[in-house]
Amino acid sequence: HQLKCLRLPRLLAQWDEDLKAAAQQRFSHARLLTHVVEHEYRQRCENARQQRLRRARIPEPWVLETYPFSRQPKLNKKAIQALYDSSSYLTQNQNIIWLGPTGIGKTGLATSFLTHAIHQGKSGRYILFAQLIAELYQAIADHTQAKVLKHYLSYDVLQIDELGYAEVEPAQVGLFFTLMQQRHKKKPTL
């Protein structure tokens, strides 16, 4: 089928319904074409968003709208909401560091910002600090540092969770510092 060959899956699945709607609403040819293209475009955007979410490897998707601010009364909800809503951390390539003891919701907040960026069309990645350090250490052993750095530099937003909970070798610190230095003021890191 030509639509399958052209990679128009939504159109292939909905063609009969689109024609029926066009007949009922007396669409012109131009209106039918506009209708079909708009729906295909929306479906592709949604598919791309879902794919970016999968690739980000977020263990538990959070959104700020469901974050339990009532459990953390010391948090400045208005400031956090303003930063989130304005997306200035994305447009100004700002890093956000969440500090505090275990269990107060740092991961949830950071993940909500990463998810928000992905919904806005950005690529992103969630990774535990220990996992990142292990990959960097392996890259040193394999002499693939440039490739690994390029990989993590490619993400529009990078969320590094549980920073400081793992012991680190001096060589690993150096490569981690290089990664952070190269991302600084170019792409946000959470």
Which role does the model predict for each range below?
Residues 164-188:
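Conserved catalytic/switch belt of AAA+ P-loop NTPases
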Residues 122-123, 154-157, 184-190:
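Loop/turn-to-beta-strand initiation segments
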